[in-house]
Amino acid sequence: MAKVAFIGLGVMGFPMAGHLVKQGHDVTVYNRTGAKATQWVEQYGGKKADTPKDAAQGQDIVFTCVGNDDDLRQVVLGEHGIVHGMHAGAILVDHTTASADVAREIAAYIEPLNIAFLDAPVSGGQAGAENGALTVMMGGDQAHFDTVKPVISAYSRCAELLGPVGAGQLTKMVNQICIAGVVQGLAEGLHFAKSAGLDGLKVIEVISKGAAQSWQMENRYKTMWQGQYDFGFAIDWMRKDLGIALDEARRNGSHLPVAALVDQFYSEVQAMKGNRWDTSSLLARLEKSRS
């Protein structure tokens, strides 16, 4: 059993922290909105703290899962941040999808304090978090990875070390770049099927048995065909992730024309008041263009 803190109880962090309790770990949570932490304690047990610093005190491992770079800096380095509560020898594991730069920044800040850092963004969405089946992409030191991997197994089906600090975030960027292209292709395929008078559900059932198969196809085609877009990762968050990837691409010289185009398409869906629709709502944009 490990003594851990979990900072950030959003749609991902809430069930992830719950899985840690279910696996027998001693868990203390903190959330910016205190009512959410109270709800979590009522549902899972464990303890809650009033500040990130308080949550981190005495813990072997501290997990964070917050919104963006600035949120991460605040909960780690702020006046009441985690860094002021962690002890030497502890490990900070960040599940936020953030920039590789902020991962390196935090690692460099806490290294002189003998606190280890692993960037560890996840993939699998809310369903993956609830079912304990996330994929975790990690950057950092092998020994620290080996220490935290058994704990992370509470909510993951795959956790791999990809390289030094920052490698986890860079891998998550690859993940989001790939998803953008796949979802746009699926949206175009369904749009074409509808325009051609085909039964889209039957079409997907057939082609998903062949080379076109993908996770997005298997999990999103029915809701897309029905025009329902509240079953997955919100566009606002996807645009944040693509923005991070496109910024990194400008620095490393990568050319991402499809990702940049899909990001623009998502901005058009936002203009349709679809900010909280999931990423499969690219089909809604195509349907609107036909009407």
UniProtKB/Swiss-Prot annotation:
It comes from the Bacteria. Its EC number is 1.1.-.-. The active site is at 172. It holds the Pfam family NAD_binding_2. GO terms for molecular function: NAD binding; NADP binding; oxidoreductase activity. GO terms for biological process: organic acid catabolic process. NAD(+) binds at residues 5-19, 97, 240. Keywords: NAD, Oxidoreductase. SUPFAM superfamilies: 6-phosphogluconate dehydrogenase C-terminal domain-like, NAD(P)-binding Rossmann-fold domains. It is an enzyme of class 1 (oxidoreductase). Belongs to the HIBADH-related family. This is Uncharacterized oxidoreductase Sfri_1503. It comes from Shewanella frigidimarina (strain NCIMB 400). The lineage of its organism: Bacteria, Pseudomonadati, Pseudomonadota, Gammaproteobacteria, Alteromonadales.
